[in-house]
From Swiss-Prot:
InterPro entries: AAA+_ATPase, AAA_22, Cdc6_C, Cdc6_lid, ORC1/CDC6, Orc1/Cdc6_arc, P-loop_NTPase, WH-like_DNA-bd_sf. ATP binds at V62, G63, K64, T65, L66, Y211, R223. It holds the Pfam family Cdc6_C. Belongs to the CDC6/cdc18 family. Involved in regulation of DNA replication. SUPFAM superfamilies: P-loop containing nucleoside triphosphate hydrolases (SSF52540), Winged helix' DNA-binding domain (SSF46785). GO terms for molecular function: ATP binding; ATP hydrolysis activity. GO terms for biological process: DNA replication. Keywords: ATP-binding, DNA replication, Nucleotide-binding. This is ORC1-type DNA replication protein 1.
Amino acid sequence: MGLEPFSPDSTIFRDESVLRDGYQPDRLIERDTELEQYQSALKPVINGAPPKNLFLYGQTGVGKTLSSRMVVERLIEDQQNIDGVDVQVIELNCKSLNSSYQVAANLINQFRPPTEQIKPTGYPSGMIYNMLFDELEALDATHCLIVLDEIDAIGNDDDILYKLPRANDNENVEDTLVGVIGISNDFTFRDNLSARVKDSLADEEIHFPPYDANELGNILKQRAGEAFHGTSAQRLDDGSYELQSDILEGDVVPLCAAFAAQDSGSARQALKRLYKAGDLARDEESDVITGAHVRQADEIVERDKVRDELTRLPTQSKLTLYSLLLLEREDETPSKRNRIYERYVMAAKRIDADVRTDRTIHDRLSQLTLKGFLDVDEQNKGPKGGSYYEYEFSIRADLAQEVLQEDERLAELFATDETSTTLDSF
């Protein structure tokens, strides 16, 4: 069978890019309060005063990065009409960086031309910070705002979040007013910052809560009006949106919004479901997108999300999951912590991994439960039996095995006949 010719989509998508990651709408809806807070916090800059240091936090997909980009772009546009104010903005995504040193080195290279870039390692930390301060001092600008997205990637090494916000106060930089805007997806990162960093960074904090189903519905309607053929969205006086569509059945948007609201309140996840539903309809050569397409899309998106999160887990967490996987195969779940720990010790020794304490694995189990991979149930057997927790998978065990087998370090655990048995019966 030969390949079919490529042809433009004339039935489903008019502009599918508006549903994909990276698209920046002209208007960000359902974030008016946060945008107003953000703009208010940056007003000192336009008055020529030292900038406030800001900390934005909230789950992935709730509008933090997009809000920041919109407000900062508006500031850059408006400052052109203000005498004596010249703002430069440096944006750095810290997702792949795991130390303050790496953040500082990457910032230095953003200021420098390609021929003068520095290596990411090999300098004393004091020298790295001095080089960064020199670059800030040499700027032909009155203000420099440094936006550090996904700053939680640096973990406990938060030195950069102390030194940069205090660069002016400590006279490390005198001719340029420096402000830091930290953006984090991790609530615990904010709580675990050292006291000196909290005092330095958080002049003002802006919390981006998860979207509810109604808010997600409006976001989806706004995007659907641009994305699909035969579809338009009108903004009403109360700020909500009314959708008219020849190809979207009435339950499509509410279902996408409901699934995403129950999941994490993420606009990104809601848009992925709507996009995948359209994709499925296109593949079927259907003239309409139905609720059935959305339900199928939800299964695919959820599986992909879980797979991605499982893949990014550290080795010790994967070993903990593997231990529960063995107990699941033996039909011994829900299982107590001590049983899981016994399997964990054996597995860790087999791959020459560090064997952590029972308490550490308990913490891992708690983290895996919070992430939604495990369910936990408290058992109370009275004065004689005592109380204890039992754990079992809340995701499909075959998916957990599939991802764990792909990990190079854990692959040998599945090499024997005993552990490579399929989990179709789960």
